[in-house]
Amino acid sequence: MNIPSIENCDLHNKTVLLRVDFNVPIKDGEIRDVTRILRALPTIQYLVNASAKIIIISHFGRPKARDNNLSLKNVIDTLSQLLNKKVKFIDDCFGEKVQRAVSVMDAGDIILLENLRFYKEEEQSDSNFAKQLASLADIYVNDAFSCSHRAHASISRITEFLPSYAGFCLQDELKYLEKAVSFKAKPITAIVGGAKISTKIKVLMKLTEKVNYLVLGGAIANNFLSFSKVNIGKSFFQNGVDDLLHNILETANKNNCKIVVPEDVLVAVNSDYSTSISRRTESILDGDIILDIGPQTLSTISSIIASSKTLLWNGPIGVFEHSAFASGTIGVMKIVSDLTHKGKLTSIIGGGDSLSAISAAGLADKDFTYVSTGGGAFLDWLSGDEMPGVAALQKRLD
């Protein structure tokens, strides 16, 4: 894909507005997974070495208003430690305080501004908001693939006001995902988990046209089981999607894509998540809540993956946050990792809670061919949808 790269830009003594994705999971004030911060470091370091002045912007969570728990101040210490360099935090995105801080920056200095989503104008793609951000800098760099499916002020609108380039994380994501969706190395298996089928209908339809096996987990699998007249007890599923399910099954059948749903499951009884009970799907009781795949399904999926050349994975198979229901997700993760290390499988993982699931399995990015930081962005890419952030950069070449 042809997009302007920061490597083709004179950065010396220029002020660069760098859009990253620091939307990291935090619990009790502690960052639980630094993957997204780590992915931004090569671009930040490159800008420092090029003697640029760097203003970092990001969103964090979905705040309704200003909220200290969702302030980017929470990531400043971790960012400074990882860079081995002091990063200054400003609790605003524009105004006199920000302008004053920017005006005294030296080459190589780094400032982190406050959460963009503290301002409703960000998600509204407000032109004036984008213009105010742009007024701080000489150059804009997008290094947030995971946000590039959003038509937000700091993602697409801002490119109207500044020379705009792609950072290394964004470039890497596009390179690997382009390779993944070329669908050349077959057989291809796709695993799709998660809660709502309506948010994944386009990607499911696309995958049934391209892959040999479509393995379903999470609440999405519950929908297919229920559609097949299997009792799913009190398990979560989405109402009013039977027509969508019918279309997916019909498309899969037409394209010789085998859809794989659980044949056995691990259930909780009466919302007790501390203990799991294994049941065949035909033996699920009214009070059961399906929270993971069972051992026979894990074995079936393992065999399918072992026969595949390419694997695309979006979303966990079970509720892996509870140890009693982590064996499915972690088991499949380890099989995929093992085959990847042996050079037998190209594995592309992204979206859902994939990053957290990889950590839960005691694995890391290096254990797979590529791990995407994108959730919705990963899905949009697989669906073939235009991504506003990427399209905006491409327009700069026209």
From Swiss-Prot:
Keyword DNA damage listed: no
Which biological process annotations from GO are given for this protein?
Answer: gluconeogenesis; glycolytic process
Localization (cell) = Cytoplasm
An example of a GO molecular function for this protein is: ATP binding
Which Gene3D superfamilies does this entry report, sorted A to Z? Phosphoglycerate kinase, N-terminal domain
Q: In which pathway does it act?
A: Carbohydrate degradation; glycolysis; pyruvate from D-glyceraldehyde 3-phosphate: step 2/5
> Which SUPFAM superfamilies does the protein's record reference?
Phosphoglycerate kinase
- Which residues are substrate-binding? D21, F22, N23, R36, H59, F60, G61, R62, R117, R150
Catalytic activity of the protein: (2R)-3-phosphoglycerate + ATP = (2R)-3-phospho-glyceroyl phosphate + ADP
- Keywords attached to this entry: ATP-binding, Cytoplasm, Glycolysis, Kinase, Nucleotide-binding, Transferase
The EC designation for this entry is 2.7.2.3
* InterPro entries in alphabetical order: Phosphoglycerate_kinase (IPR001576), Phosphoglycerate_kinase_CS (IPR015911), Phosphoglycerate_kinase_N (IPR015824), Phosphoglycerate_kinase_sf (IPR036043)
Q: Its GO CC terms?
A: cytosol
> Which residues does the record give as ATP binding sites?
K200, E321, G351, G352, D353, S354
Its family remark reads: Belongs to the phosphoglycerate kinase family.
Q: What does the record note on quaternary structure?
A: Monomer.
Protein name (database record) = Phosphoglycerate kinase
Phylogenetic placement of the source organism: Bacteria, Pseudomonadati, Pseudomonadota, Alphaproteobacteria, Rickettsiales
